Amino acid sequence: MTVNDALKAASSQIAPACEISGANPVRVAKALLMRQLGVKIEWIFLNLNRELEDADGYFALAKRFANHEPLEYITGEAGFYGLSFNVKKGVLIPRPETEILVEKSLEILSNLPARKRPPLVAEIGAGSGIISICLALNSNAKIIASDISDDALNLARQNAAKFGVEDRIEFIKCAYLDQIYGQFDLLVSNPPYIARDYELDKFVLNEPHEALFGGAAGDEILKNIILVAKNRGVKYLACEMGYDQKASLESVLELSGFEAEFYRDLAGFDRGVVARNAFSNL
């Protein structure tokens, strides 16, 4: 079987799953082949008529995708903010909309008053480390990031080392900021915010549920983060949120003394909030 024939067969095999994920079958088939052979896309174009070695191994990867395993888990990598991060099953896959949260956080850091010390940032729910790493790469901030998952923390440390910022980020296993101390200029988080009974597609359901579902309404963890920020005197708060949570979070932010500005994602949905603590002494 040639490379071209294998691509056509795999594209047909994964087509039903692609209808669920919204992915292009041909692109997924090529990505799987690149993973199987350890080659770049140029190799595929130059070798379409070449006999494919270990076709069985390739179709085994296609079967995993056909069974709704996310492509990122199969390839072991995900693109985010122009970089390629390591990912693995058991840790949330980066989403494009979270790049907006990174941009908003960098805006906050760039507008802080000049000090002798670098800005101090806390992240709740580090996951694969993408937010903290992007902030470290694009600012002089010192960052402390928490997560309750050992798998996530180990992966985050690997990614930090991959990009050479492991000395700028401290990863700690704890909930919220329970074991983290300091006066923070910014608290950033992309927490679980999906309502417990919200119906997700089969691909998303392969991701860790503790990183997806935020409670019965979905906004419970976000509300706790706001209270943590208030009690710790955090100057700025930046969080991703669900499309239908603006009203409930707005009232909690106001009662907690935060001046909030909500932002939308590229699809036009409410997706996050940036808030300033009017009572912070930082």
Where are these regions (language model features)?
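A short N-terminal interaction module
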Residues: 1-51, 57-58
